[in-house]
C-alpha cells in the first residue's frame, strides 16, 4: 500500500514538472497509488483497460503502415473533429459507443475536412474491409515497436485548453454571465464519458457555477450507473435531477459519453424539473443565437441555419422572422458538416447554427460535427441572459409557442433482432413506398421519397438528396410523418410532428396521427 502511494506521488510530481510524461497503468481506477493521476492528468494518464487498449491498438496499427499518429486520450468527439482541421491532418478516429450501450462500441472516422466521412467515402472504406479474408494477415505492430520517426505523439492538456479557448470566443452574452453566472446553479453529469474536463473548463472560464454528479464523473466503459447513457432519456438524467433538487439548482446538463449530445432539464413555473426534447432545445438555441446576433448588429444578410429534415419545423418561422435562410439535410450531422464546407468554399452563406432532434447542436465552424461542449456553454449563458432580462428559459419557450403555434414532435422506434433485421426494416419501408397512405383526420400534401430523390405532390419535383431509404409525408396545415431505418442500430424510426392551436389541441393531434399511421404498418 505504502509503496503504491509513494510511486503515485512521485510520478505526479514528475508529471507536474514535465508535460511530456504520460502514464499507462492497468488499474488507475482502482489502485490507491495511481488513482489520483487520472483525476489530475486526464489527458496523460491512461488506464489500459477496454477503451485505452483499443486506442493504443489503433495507433499502433496506423503507425505500422507509415502514418504519424496524434494520440488524444479521453476526449470528446467534437474535439477530434476540431483537431483534424486545426492540425491539417488526413483524418481522425474516435472509438466510441456514443449514446448507446457498451455493446455498440465502434469506430467513427473523420475526413481531412473534420466532418464525418460522407456515404461515398464510407463506401470506399467498406470496400477495402470486405476485401480482407484473413484478419491475422493484416500488417500490424506492437505499441512498443513503433518507430520514432513514424510514431505516436501524445498531445497534452494544451490541446484541451486551445479547444476551450476557441469555444469561449463564441459566447454571446458575456455581460449577463459576468453579472449572474456565479449565482446560477447548474448540475452537470458527463454520464461516465469524456465531457467532464472540457465542459467544466469552459463553464468555469466564463464564471458559471457548476456542481457535478460525482458518481458519473470518471470515464467508465461499462456505464455502470445507467442502463443507456443517452441524455435524451429521462432515466439517464435521474441522478443529475436528484442532485439539483437537493442543492436547489436551476438547470441540469447531461452529455453522452463522447460528449456530442446534450440533454437538458429545467424548472417550470411550479419549480418542478422537466426534461426538454432535442427539438425544444434546438428551437430555444436557434432563437437565442439569432436574437443576440441581431441585438449586437452582427446578423449577416446571408446567414443560414441548418437542421435535419426530421427535426422540428418550428424553427422555420423563427428563421423567417430574423431574415435567415433555413436549410434541411438528411439525418446525420455529416450532412450539416458538408453544408458548412460548401458555404466556406462558395461564400454563399454564413453558418449560424445547426441542430438535430437527437440532441445534437453546433455553433461555430471550429468543428463540423455536433458539439455538446459548446451547446452547454450556449444554454448556460442563455439562462443567464434571460434572467438578466427578468424572464426565464421556460417562459421564453412558452412565448415561442404562443407566437408560432404549439408544435409537438414525437419519435417512435420499433426494434428488430437478428441478421435479417435490416431486410425486415427495408421491407416495411418498401411496402409503404408502394402504398397510398391515408390517415383519418390528416391530408397528405406531398410525399418525399429520398431513395428516388423525388417529391410528389401536385407536381413532381427533384430533391437535393437521393439514395437514402426514407419516406417523408408532408401534412396539410403543417407537420409531417417520416419513416426510415436507423443508421446506427436495428430500429425502424418513425418521426411525427403536428401543429396545434394550444398544447391540448396538439396533444390530441399527435395521438391521433401516431395511432392512425402505426395501423398502416401492421
Regions found by a protein language model. Name each.
Residues 40, 58-65, 82-88, 287-294, ...:
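Alpha-helix C-terminal capping segments
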Residues 1-64:
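Thiamine diphosphate
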Residues 62-104, 204-205, 209-263:
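N-terminal small/polar loop signature for handling phosphorylated ligands or for N-terminal nucleophile
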Residues 104-111, 260-279, 315:
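Short Gly/Thr/Asp-enriched flexible loops that form oxyanion-binding sites at enzyme active sites
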Residues 25-28, 44-57, 69-78, 274-281, ...:
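Active-site nucleophile and cofactor-binding loops and adjacent substrate-binding regions
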Residues 110-141, 279-303, 307-318, 372, ...:
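Glycine-rich phosphate-binding loop plus the immediately following alpha-helix
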Residues 105-239, 243-244:
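Gly/Ser/Thr-enriched, mixed-charge loops and adjacent short helices
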Residues 245, 249-251, 272-274, 292-484, ...:
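Phosphate-binding and adjacent anionic-ligand microenvironments
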